[in-house]
A protein has these predicted regions:
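Basic/aromatic-rich interaction segments and small domains that mediate binding to polyanionic partners
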Residues: 2-70
Length: 70
């Protein structure tokens, strides 16, 4: 299991992608293993993807929501 806040390898890094949850398109900049909440006091971690839109702003989403464009 990855360490908390560790950057993860992803086959779509630096490629054009779409966030299927919001429809946002951009370049996948990073995937980071982050705390997303707690269950019975235990932290829960999930891979979070960061997509940079053409405007330069970044959006975070679940890594499972990332889809290749094209």
């Amino acid at each position: 299991m990855p360490e908390a806040y560790e950057h993860l390898r992803h086959p779509l890094l630096r490629r054009p992608v779409r966030d299927i949850a919001s429809g946002t398109e951009g370049e996948l900049m990073a995937v980071v293993y982050e705390e997303v909440g707690q269950v019975c006091g235990d932290p829960q971690y999930k891979p979070i993807a960061y997509i940079r839109m053409p405007s330069g702003r970044e959006l975070s989403t679940a890594a499972s929501n990332v889809q290749a464009l094209g």
